[in-house]
C-alpha cells in the first residue's frame, strides 16, 4: 500500500516536471520555427547533463536557439565568439595582482556562466579547445595551480560551420566524444521559411520568453532524469546496438562504452521529459542518431554515419 502511494507521488512529480518541459518547448517553437525535433533533442541532452555540438551553416538560427534555451530555462547565459588568437585565460579567467592589498585576485572568465555558447569552436586554437573541453568534462578549471568549481548546472553549446576549412582547427575525435550530442538544424521547411519572412526576425521573440525554471530547479530535474528506471532488457538492447557498430566493414572504429552510457543517459532524459519513469525501446531509438553520429567515421564508400546508424536500428531487433 505504502509502495503504491509512493509510486503514485513519484509519477505525479514526473508528470508535473514533464509539463513544465513541454511548456518550455512550446515557447521555443515560437522562436525557432519548424524545428521541434532538434529542440526536443537539445532539451533531452541538457536534462541528461550533457553538452551539445551544433554543426550547421551560418544564418539558420544556432545562436538564437541557444539564447532562447538559456532564457526559457532561467540560466545565466554568455556567448563567446572563438577566434584563433584567443588564449585559455580569455575563457577561464586570470589572476590580477592588487599591489595595495599585496595579493592576487582571481577574475573569472566567461566559462563561469551556467550556459555557455562557444561560437565557432573550430576557430579556436587546439590549446583553447582543450581548455574548454577539460572544463566540460571536469566541471572545474585550474588557474595558476588553484581549482575553481564551475556553476551547477554547467552547459556548453558549441557551434561550428562544417563547410569552412580555412583558418579552422577541426576537433579531434577524442574531443568530439566529450559532446553528448551533435545536432544540425538544417534549412527551415518551406512553410516555416515563408512565415519567417512574413513575421520578421525571430530574435524579437526572445524578450517575451518566460523561464519555466531556474538553475536550482533544472539541477533537480537532471537528478530525477538520471533516476529513470532502465531495465536489463533496455541495457541489453543498447549493448547490441553498440556491438553492431563494431562489426567489420562499417566504421573505422566502433562505439566505446562511454558512447553507450551516453545513449543510456539520453534515453533516460527522453523518457523523463515525456512523463515516464522508465525507458522504452522507442526512447533509445529517439536519441540513438544524435548521440552517436559524431563519434563514428565510416569506411570509404560505406555511406554516411547517419545512414549506417539507421541501418543498425533497422536490423537490431528489440527483444
Predicted stretch roles:
Residues 56, 119-120, 131:
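Walker B catalytic acidic pair
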Residues 47-83:
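Walker A/P-loop
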Residues 208-263:
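Conserved AAA+ ATPase small/helical "lid" subdomain
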Residues 18-57:
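Pre-Walker A (pre-P-loop) alpha-helix and adjacent loop at the N terminus of AAA/AAA+ ATPase modules
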Residues 52, 116, 154:
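Conserved beta-strand position immediately N-terminal to the Walker
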Residues 247-319:
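C-terminal engagement/docking regions of AAA+ P-loop ATPases
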Residues 41-44, 97-117:
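Conserved alpha-helical scaffold flanking the Walker A/P-loop in AAA+ ATPase domains
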Residues 98-103, 120-128, 136-213, 219-228, ...:
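Canonical AAA+ ATPase core
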